[in-house]
């Protein structure tokens, strides 16, 4: 998901190619969620002018959410009948376990179409095991990038999956997952690859990209050449593109990294498509972003809000409410937390002392005007609000805050600006990161976006948060494939029950 870096394809290439990343496998699904197939063709055209190759997997469906949320474009089985025949299509992207388990019509249709076109099916199966995993694999999924520990990795590999070990800026699984190779069975390395999934511009500039994962694997005890194979030929074979890339031999594309020391694995020079394109962590030529069409101008098609939109009304005047607060225990762990909150004048009052604040997702594509509202914990905001239109998987507008007034101000500001990320306090903007391309990415230089990322996180921490990436933790909330709770424009979601829930558990009038 290059879009989570908030960098456009052009800017992303400027950041990652000098670190040795020459190809990316992606569904480009965030771009699709805010545009349509015409928008996708624009991104394909942008890729062709970049030194970074993108091997596209057609998203198994959009939206990815259960129950279904709102996006700009719905990717259905009928769409698959067309796009799987495109030359850009190399498979079906990130098929989530629950959609197979529930026999979702579009998902099974996409998989069936892939069988007709001899295309591989890529997976997303966090914490799947036993019979649930067996049934999932029978659908034809060949690989996964969602394992929380090495035991999960080993089970999936023993059942025939190719495993991508993920190390993102908020999920640090590589050291633990690599134990499958360093402690259980070194021969498993042949079917292990790497995945960054979601990384910020800051992370890329400070640590690197795929080269960083190679170094981390070596540090974890993997032989340098084996770690390099994980980042090259193993990945190419997993995605069935090894006839094009992944090795230096006749008939393959000349993507070559020049490295002095395999142990340190610091990339000095990069060749893509037979041309020297990067040296000393910089491209050797000027790369310009394309002129953006109206599809990606970033207009938010939603009405201005008021504080009342973010006030939780209940049918008692005064008293107490027992609420279910979505409690973040990590970027991909959301648990239930029951909290007693005061009710005043018919409105449930957020309580910063109990770390129980409000969170909402506002539909921004002009489809239905949905605004969900729920309670959340873990951010420890004492004041203000923060909001983002970069919010996978739907990229609706997510806002959270200690009070309804600042939440409304943050939403209205992003509507005026055409998208981005903002932190506000007492009706004033503390920091703003503009994302003019579809409301999700920027054509600015990676260094510029990274500097703004740092200021946004610093501003969020000034409101009281002690999370490492407060904004990123927030904008992951709409992902319903993460246990145990999520929030979309359709409402708060119970991952286990695959349905929305009422956050008000009990009311006591006083």
Residue positions per predicted region:
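Structural motif
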Residues: 22-24, 52-55, 89-93, 119-122, ...
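Di-metal (Zn2+ and/or Mg2+/Mn2+) metal-binding site signature of metallo-dependent hydrolases
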Residues: 1-13
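Divalent-metal coordination cores built from histidine and acidic residues
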Residues: 13-120, 185, 430-434
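Short, ordered loop/turn segments at secondary-structure junctions
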Residues: 1-2, 28-31, 59-60, 97, ...
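Divalent metal-coordination and catalytic microenvironments
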Residues: 20, 92, 156, 197, ...
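Histidine/acidic residue-rich metal-binding segments in metalloenzymes
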Residues: 73-93, 99-165, 172-194, 205-219, ...
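Active-site microenvironment of metallo-dependent hydrolases
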Residues: 205-221, 225-510
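A generic structural signal for well-ordered alpha-helical segments
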Residues: 16, 47, 114-115, 136, ...
